[in-house]
Amino acid sequence: KRDESKLLLYKEGKVSESIFKHITDYLPEGSLMVFNNTRVIQARLLFQKETGAKIEIFCLEPVEPHDYALVFQQTECCRWTCLVGNLKKWKEGLLKKEVQLDGETVILKAEKLQTCGDSYLIEFTWDHPTCTFADLLDAAGVLPIPPYLNRETEKSDLQTYQTVYSKIKGSVA
């Protein structure tokens, strides 16, 4: 049960534990609680170059279009600010990935357009006119779980890693 999750408490220099369903016991009267209703998306895309090198692209924030709802509806092209894993193996050129979607093979391409500090502007294009970027992330993306969990993403994480209030796609971690 989700309400049985561990709740860490800090009071007067001491740390103790409880469970989430008892959170109201620890909140002062008149407190305001703000709930995050965004769903964590499958924002990690794993590509393999023809040389065998593996490149991970972690979509952080949409650039074109900038609105999450709009970028998920895009067909054929969108741009994101991304982190790139194993960047030294991706000097130039397009990365390509075959994605199986409703019995069809869609070719997803990624092109590194420019550096943005520690991240990169990546343009994604694909060859299927009715396939949305949300469809591609659902089919080919991996849910980004924190590295401190020391494990790969599991299928059950698609539900259990979300907050109980999550409705709108848009979080990446």
Could you describe each region identified by the protein language model?
Residues 1-173:
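A cross-family signal for N-terminal binding/gating loops and helix N-caps
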